[in-house]
């Protein structure tokens, strides 16, 4: 049996930008050639791409680390490094993407060919050509490439189907799907024969078509994780119409009406919005003895429990998946209902990460933090400060002096002095150590 994987956490790391170069023009008859170090190339992004042929996240079972290539370093004679190609990671349609640490929604990928950048590549470092000025016409200053974005993301697959077949185990959902489509799900006379969602394309007698999904059987407590639990309840979220399949034969000693209430309770417990979707009750196994009697009793109980006398009655279609009796009217009614039912947005209250740039003042957190270690050294940290540190090329004295000026401009010296730092104290940024000088 092919394995079905519908939730996975992966690590993505974009490519680092290429380093800028310190170089000078050295040619015969050009005594004052000046700086000639080129810029580094842009690092590659990590991009998710929807691939229509994929149906599961199985490809991520053994490969969960994705790293884009860095940009090319700058070269002499003013030549810039080449930007790296993006790393394309294929995902099936219906994949939602979240930040694993914050839980924030990054994107919802549903259309073939749709792309989503999940990690941005770093920009290339500037070569010494960029730092030339009248005051310093021959600078020995160049930047390292900017680090690429690194993050953990969660991929969650929710199958794309117009119609979802729900019900208790062994009520005949898989048999029904095999009859109305070309899908060939595993069918057996025991509970939980279906362990993965099965998709099938259904065509009605008048030529209309829709996608239907046979979802694994639910049991009481599924919304709290009992049985197959929430693992497959999520797949119902994308459906527009629910076919609620009920075993009317009562052969296992079950009450059809109690089954109906129990399944609806699980749907509501998982997500209240599932109850907004229109339902069609499929009274299955009508070829069995006592099925007619059970159906009449079911209709009686359903009418008795109606709270709104003006609400439309739920459509009930008696069928037999084995003899195929009543199948055609059911499919036509389902297609009719789909034509008037809109799509239900999955994430109305959540804001998807935007790729557009908004200009304007945005208050930021502190640019750096200072901590005191037990060995009396000082540790500097902070996203902006660490980024400056990583983009500094310490092989050239001028670049080191520039970094010192940047720290002073950020107020690091003043803050250290205010915390009690004295001449000769050790200051650390990452693995780098230097002495504090007043």
From Swiss-Prot:
Protein name according to UniProt: GTPase Obg
Segments forming domain OBG-type G: 161-339
Signal sequence range: none
SS bonds (residue pairs): none
Natural source organism: Enterococcus faecalis (strain ATCC 700802 / V583)
Keywords: Cytoplasm, GTP-binding, Hydrolase, Magnesium, Metal-binding, Nucleotide-binding
A GO biological process held by the record: ribosome biogenesis
InterPro entries: G_OBG, GTP-bd, GTP-bd_Obg/CgtA, GTP-bd_prot_GTP1/OBG_C_sf, GTP1-OBG_CS, GTP1_OBG_dom, GTP1_OBG_dom_sf, OBG_GTPase
Enzyme nomenclature, EC number: 3.6.5.-
Location relative to the cell: Cytoplasm
Gene Ontology annotations for the cellular component aspect, listed alphabetically: cytoplasm
Region (Disordered): 128-147
NCBIfam families hit by this protein: Obg_CgtA (TIGR02729), Obg_CgtA_exten (TIGR03595), PRK12296.1 (NF008954), PRK12297.1 (NF008955), PRK12299.1 (NF008956), small_GTP (TIGR00231)
GO molecular function annotations of the record: GTP binding; GTPase activity; magnesium ion binding
Enzyme class: hydrolase
Physiological role: An essential GTPase which binds GTP, GDP and possibly (p)ppGpp with moderate affinity, with high nucleotide exchange rates and a fairly low GTP hydrolysis rate. Plays a role in control of the cell cycle, stress response, ribosome biogenesis and in those bacteria that undergo differentiation, in morphogenesis control.
């Amino acid at each position: 049996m092919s394995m079905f994987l519908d939730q996975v956490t992966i690590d993505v790391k974009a490519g680092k930008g290429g380093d800028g170069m310190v170089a000078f023009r050295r040619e015969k008859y050009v005594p004052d050639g000046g700086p000639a170090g080129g810029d580094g190339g842009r690092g590659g992004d990590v991009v998710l791409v929807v691939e229509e042929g994929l149906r599961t996240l199985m490809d991520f079972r053994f490969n969960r680390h994705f790293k884009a290539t860095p940009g090319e370093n700058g070269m002499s004679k003013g030549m810039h490094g080449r930007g790296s190609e993006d790393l394309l990671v294929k995902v099936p349609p219906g994949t939602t993407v979240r930040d694993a640490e914050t839980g924030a929604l990054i994107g919802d990928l549903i259309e073939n060919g749709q792309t989503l950048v999940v990690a941005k590549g770093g920009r290339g470092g500037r070569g010494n050509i960029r730092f030339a000025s009248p005051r310093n016409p021959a600078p020995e200053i160049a930047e390292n490439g900017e680090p690429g974005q690194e993050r953990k993301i969660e991929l969650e697959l929710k199958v794309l189907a117009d119609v979802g077949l729900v019900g208790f185990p062994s009520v005949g959902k898989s048999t029904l799907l095999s009859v109305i489509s070309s899908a060939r799900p595993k069918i057996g006379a025991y509970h939980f024969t279906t362990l993965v969602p099965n998709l099938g394309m259904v065509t009605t007698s008048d030529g209309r078509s829709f996608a239907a999904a046979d979802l694994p059987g639910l049991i009481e407590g599924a919304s709290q994780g009992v049985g197959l639990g929430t693992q497959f309840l999520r797949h119902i979220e994308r459906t527009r119409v629910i076919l609620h399949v009920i075993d009317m034969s009562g052969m296992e000693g079950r009450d059809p009406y109690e089954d109906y209430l129990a399944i609806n309770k699980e749907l509501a417990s998982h997500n209240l919005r599932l109850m907004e979707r229109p339902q069609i009750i499929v009274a299955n196994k009508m070829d069995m003895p006592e099925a007619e009697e059970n159906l009449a009793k079911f209709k009686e109980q359903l009418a008795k429990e109606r709270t709104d006398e003006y609400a439309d009655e739920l459509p009930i279609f008696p069928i037999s998946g084995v003899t195929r009796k009543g199948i055609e009217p059911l499919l036509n009614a389902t297609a009719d209902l789909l034509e008037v039912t809109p799509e239900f947005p999955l994430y109305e209250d959540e804001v998807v990460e935007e790729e557009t740039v908004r200009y304007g003042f945005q208050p930021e957190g502190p640019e750096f933090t200072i901590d005191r270690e037990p060995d009396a050294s000082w540790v500097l940290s902070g996203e902006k400060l660490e980024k400056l540190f990583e983009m500094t090329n310490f092989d050239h004295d001028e670049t080191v002096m520039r970094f010192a000026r940047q720290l002073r401009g950020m107020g690091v010296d003043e803050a250290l002095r205010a915390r009690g730092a004295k001449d000769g104290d050790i200051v650390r940024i990452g693995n780098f150590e230097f002495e504090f000088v007043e």
